[in-house]
Amino acid sequence: MNDKVSLIDMPATPVAYFRHVGPYGPPVARFWMERVAPWMEENKLLGRVRYGIAHDDPTITEPAKCRYDACVVAEPKEVLSGSPLRTALPGGRYACTRFHGTVDEVDAAWQRLLGGWLPTSGLQLDARPLLERYPVEAKYDPQTGIFECDICIPVKPL
């Protein structure tokens, strides 16, 4: 695996989120563009870090039942329209690598991290969620569909 992997200790992070149920890939991209981004703009949240959490493995769970949470950092006491769900992403050590590509390419990047890097790292997954982290400066090109994010897996010693 040629991707640079960094170990990052993330703090617990309060978020507001909306859940998409259905296939991953282009439907999730549409969910962000049609539902989440307008809500973020309405609530003046566009300059914040965002997270994506895919809860299910579509090779095990029927794609129509796969769950994905589109999250934005938000303090619990912030008043937000649209009735978002709230939670705190658990803190801890994550192995992260920068992704730059299209929705169709992101699965291969996950596989390189999980199947290529992790087995030789001296670490193992723990029970916290796998994350796509979208830093404030992350780019998205609507013409090409190319976007940037950090893909992050929760790790602990073997």
Model-assigned labels for residue ranges:
Residues 1-158:
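A solvent-exposed interaction/effector surface
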